[in-house]
Amino acid sequence: MVLQQATKVRLWGNATPNSSLKVRSSWDNTEYTAQVNDQGRWEIWVQTPSASFEKQQLTLKNGQDKIVLHDLLIGEVWFGSGQSNMEMPLRGFWHCPIEGGNHAIATSGKYKNSIRYATIQRVGALEPKDYPVGGEWKVCDPRNAPEFGATAYF
């Protein structure tokens, strides 16, 4: 995961209704507290430091439940959005290779500690959603890079 540097970032989720949730950041060891509403929803704003390739973590506690988000980077978050031009992966499509794609994939490991990539699931809805749809952050390496969007990568 990557959090935008030098700003307040919004974290949110679900927890035990009418309880409190604590979030602790590894970069400054600050503990933040959020009140969980009667529907089990919470949100909190956390101050982030300047960009760094040093891996960070966030610890979330709600009663006996504890979640630790590891391998977190603080830096610039870029969004690549569009249609097929943004969807084409570094590996290319069948009979549609990406110029320089194979070399980029083979050498992508050099960015393992500095680039993270997430593809957000495509989901349609007729009404606005309360929460964004899922996705998973991937480390930049030859195993994951073939699926990275080529336009966003280059």
Regions found by a protein language model. Give the residues of each.
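Cell-envelope and extracellular/periplasmic
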Residues: 1-154
